[in-house]
């Protein structure tokens, strides 16, 4: 995957969102689609710099919403990495690196009011890296910042999974005041389960929340306990805002 994946401590500058075991997934999929249409490609594929006289034949770009929807609703990590590098490319142009992305995220954290943003470790776009370190406080400050910017909030909130309805929360909090109310992103890595997002309390107050449970796993039931605790907290917040 690139930076932050433990085996890349040699500061490898090649960072692509769809890179597995030195195999370019995009090129493989593209060649496969060409073959389906009777077009066969010989030789090897890889990444190279374009010659100065190269002409663009075609450009395909998906709307941001169509990428962020599966990224947030279904926790699609491919999309998350792609958005991370697309953000850097938009700001810096070709040759985007993870380090540039890390700098951009920390600047946004500072703008959102996160104190000492440099102390947090942001190394990738998906959050799957074992080197990522954030806190519930930092996440709530980012959620608050989005809420304070109406266009961002309206766009972002409607793409989050909805409790008891869709995405990674479709089977959770059903039959409670949190169902259809909680809009939140789940997070799952080894030993960690998290949930952060928004809900509306019974008094009409809008609440941003972040819950991170560490030291849990699926083998001893602690992961399920963590999810149940998260759901219960959301139910209590939705029913009893005091």
Give each language-model segment a name:
Residues 84-242:
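Small-residue-rich helix-loop
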Residues 1-155:
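A small/polar active-site loop signature that marks catalytic segments
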